[in-house]
């Protein structure tokens, strides 16, 4: 199937998406979500699109964004054609796929952006991937409200064009936060695409459609235009801070393989290098969800630095919004730059000088220069007062009046400085810095984990004939009292006002998100234990002492328990589920024939 001639979509565009194709895309999503379709025509459309299920597990669509003299930045191609994007989403993609004009990015540039999914979608694409989400670390789970855009932008002089420059971006739109993986994919396909155009893009998309599903924990072999990428997506069961390396097999095609040591991590030290003296303070700001702006000379620097900041509190998830690259055209521009209220909990990466004035009321601003290649170390920036920041041309520095709660760890600074003097590779420095952040985060979170675990009711309080007991309430003062004996001092030598840091954290979006996640996990555990308790009962003996109405009610409740276990992915052993099914079947068979028939006809078994 050949691609048609490019249709242009963008700000002020005269084109429109093929609505039938868009409806078909939604039909595929509905089908995957288990939502019934209303008529035969839609059902036929769904069956015709099943071939794109493999593609949809990895990508929402691929866009080509070019510069039109009449329309400005415009989406020239969306592939597959049935992919659905709203006008608002297309406008955001248009502006976020090009560097600001002041960046002067000649040649090839790669960066990443993140944008809000338009409201009003009946079924979001993320429903296709939920089955894999449960095994992912929390920081790699998809956010149903956001898309990622991975960009390969080319700008070269071309005298044959009126504008004098060839300017085009190949953009991968995905729900998956696999930054390193998608940048690697773009490195393989974008240069060839700019030479060979649409037929090459179609062939690459067909390759993606044949990929296995993104299952966490498995070594995946992903062919793309003659090469094979070998990757492993982490699982929530991996030990934090360890990387399960993909092994190179002794096969004839080894010379064509690319082995990715990570799917999501950025070069942490390269990003923190200009500010590594203040890395612990930045860790605190990110942990507390403070409003933070990264002002950088190009989208590459801004996006890498924002992603490094978000990554520094791993394995905690950063629950607030973050925008690796943000422009004045963004649909949330007014929301995030208004002075009528306090700046929101968000990390923004910007390159336009206009932001130096627009965001000067924000409490924490990082101004960085060009990130140096590995081996070249920029001069360390200082912490400066916010009033000294007037323009984006201001000197690099961390502009804030924030006073850290913890004393600076001089040991990590000495370690990194020694690495600089010895010309230690950036990758090795990143390992040291990542381990430091991990140990710091774990020292902080372990006391919280220990206290939250104590909120779980005792297993002996779970009765099969009563609703599962509730978790005890989280009481901040009760938690604070536990810190004297089981606080972070057990695992960290860093001194300072840990209590003050905890008090501030308990008010933050990161605590709110973390606690909601833990509470959900513990509630599901209680439901699973309740299910196991039911399975251990002699239910046939129970029904002998109760009426038929009570027995039917029990069957319906047990069926609902089974449905809940599947729907919510409760941590129930397979043999427990099988045991419960056997109980249900035995109870139904003990009922009169007419009741058996009713339960069977209504699909209750």
UniProtKB/Swiss-Prot annotation:
Q: Where is the dDENN domain?
A: 392-525
Q: GO MF terms on file?
A: guanyl-nucleotide exchange factor activity
This protein's major location comes to other
Give start and end of each cDENN domain: 265-390
The answer to whether keyword Phosphoprotein applies is yes
Q: Which InterPro entries match?
A: ABL9/DENND6_dom, DENND6, Tripartite_DENN
Any one Gene Ontology cellular component term annotated for this protein: recycling endosome
Task: Tell me the keywords, alphabetical order.
Answer: Cytoplasm, Endosome, Guanine-nucleotide releasing factor, Methylation, Phosphoprotein
Single biological process term from Gene Ontology: positive regulation of cell-cell adhesion mediated by cadherin
- Kindly list the places in or outside the cell where this protein is found, as annotated in its UniProt entry: Recycling endosome; Cytoplasm
- Which positions bear N6-methyllysine? 507
Q: Which residues form the uDENN domain?
A: 60-239
Q: Region Disordered: start and end of each range?
A: 1-20
Positions where Phosphoserine occurs in the chain:
124
- Report the protein's function: Guanine nucleotide exchange factor (GEF) for RAB14. Component of an endocytic recycling pathway that is required for the control of ADAM10 transport, shedding of N-cadherin/CDH2 by ADAM9 or ADAM10 and regulation of cell-cell junctions. Required for RAB14 recruitment to recycling endosomes.
| Family per similarity comment | Belongs to the DENND6 family.
Q: Which protein are we looking at?
A: Protein DENND6A
Task: Show the taxonomic lineage.
Answer: Eukaryota, Metazoa, Chordata, Craniata, Vertebrata
Whichever gene encodes this chain, its name is: Dennd6a
């Amino acid at each position: 199937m050949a691609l048609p001639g490019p249709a242009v979509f963008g700000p002020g565009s005269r084109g429109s998406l093929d609505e039938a194709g868009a409806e078909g895309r939604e039909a595929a999503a509905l089908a995957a979500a288990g939502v019934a379709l209303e008529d035969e025509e839609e059902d036929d459309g769904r069956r015709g699109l099943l071939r794109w299920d493999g593609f949809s597990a990895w990508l929402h669509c691929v866009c080509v964004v070019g510069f039109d003299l009449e329309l400005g930045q415009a989406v020239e191609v969306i592939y597959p054609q049935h992919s659905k994007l709203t006008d608002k989403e297309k406008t955001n993609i248009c502006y976020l796929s090009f560097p600001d004009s002041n960046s002067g990015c000649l040649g090839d540039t790669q960066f990443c952006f993140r944008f809000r999914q338009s409201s009003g979608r009946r079924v979001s694409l993320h429903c296709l991937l939920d089955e894999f989400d449960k095994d992912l670390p929390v920081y790699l789970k998809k956010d149903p409200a956001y898309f990622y855009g991975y960009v390969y932008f080319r700008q070269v002089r071309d005298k044959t064009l009126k504008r004098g420059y060839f300017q085009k971006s190949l953009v991968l739109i995905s729900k998956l936060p696999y930054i390193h993986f998608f940048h690697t994919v773009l490195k393989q396909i974008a240069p060839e695409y700019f030479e060979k155009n649409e037929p090459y893009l179609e062939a690459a998309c067909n390759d993606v459609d044949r990929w296995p599903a993104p299952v966490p924990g498995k070594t995946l072999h992903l062919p793309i235009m003659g090469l094979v990428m070998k990757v492993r997506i982490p699982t929530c069961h991996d030990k934090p801070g360890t990387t399960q390396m993909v092994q190179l097999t002794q096969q004839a095609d080894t010379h064509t393989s690319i082995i990715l040591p990570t799917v999501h991590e950025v070069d942490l030290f390269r990003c923190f290098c200009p500010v590594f003296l203040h890395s612990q303070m930045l860790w605190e700001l990110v942990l507390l969800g403070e409003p933070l702006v990264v002002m950088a000379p190009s989208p590459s620097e801004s996006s890498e630095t924002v992603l490094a900041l978000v990554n520094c509190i791993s394995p905690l998830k950063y629950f607030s919004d973050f925008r690796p690259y943000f422009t004045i055209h963004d649909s949330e521009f007014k929301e995030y730059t208004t002075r009528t209220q306090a700046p929101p909990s968000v990390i923004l990466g910007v390159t336009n000088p206009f932001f130096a004035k627009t965001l000067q009321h924000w409490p924490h601003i990082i101004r960085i220069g060009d990130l140096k290649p590995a081996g070249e170390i920029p001069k360390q920036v200082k912490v400066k007062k916010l009033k000294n920041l007037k323009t984006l041309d201001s000197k690099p520095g961390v502009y804030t009046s924030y006073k850290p709660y913890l004393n600076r760890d001089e040991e990590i600074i000495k370690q990194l400085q020694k690495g600089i003097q010895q010309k230690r590779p950036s990758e090795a420095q990143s390992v040291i810095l990542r381990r430091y952040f991990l140990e710091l985060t774990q020292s902080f979170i372990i006391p919280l984990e220990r206290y939250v675990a104590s909120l779980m009711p005792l297993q002996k309080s779970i009765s099969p004939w009563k609703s599962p007991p509730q978790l005890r309430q989280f009481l901040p003062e009760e938690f604070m009292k536990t810190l004297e004996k089981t606080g972070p001092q057990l695992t960290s030598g860093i001194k300072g006002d840990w209590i003050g840091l905890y008090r501030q954290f308990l008010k933050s979006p990161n605590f709110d998100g973390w606690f909601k996640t833990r509470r959900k996990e513990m509630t599901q555990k209680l439901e699973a234990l309740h299910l196991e308790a039911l399975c251990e009962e002699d239910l046939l003996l129970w029904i002998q002492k109760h009426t038929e109405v009570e027995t039917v009610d029990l069957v319906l409740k047990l069926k609902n328990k089974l449905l809940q276990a599947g729907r919510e992915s409760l941590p129930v052993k397979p043999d427990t589920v099988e045991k419960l099914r056997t109980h249900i079947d035995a109870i139904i068979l003990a009922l009169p024939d007419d009741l058996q028939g009713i339960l069977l006809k209504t699909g209750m078994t």
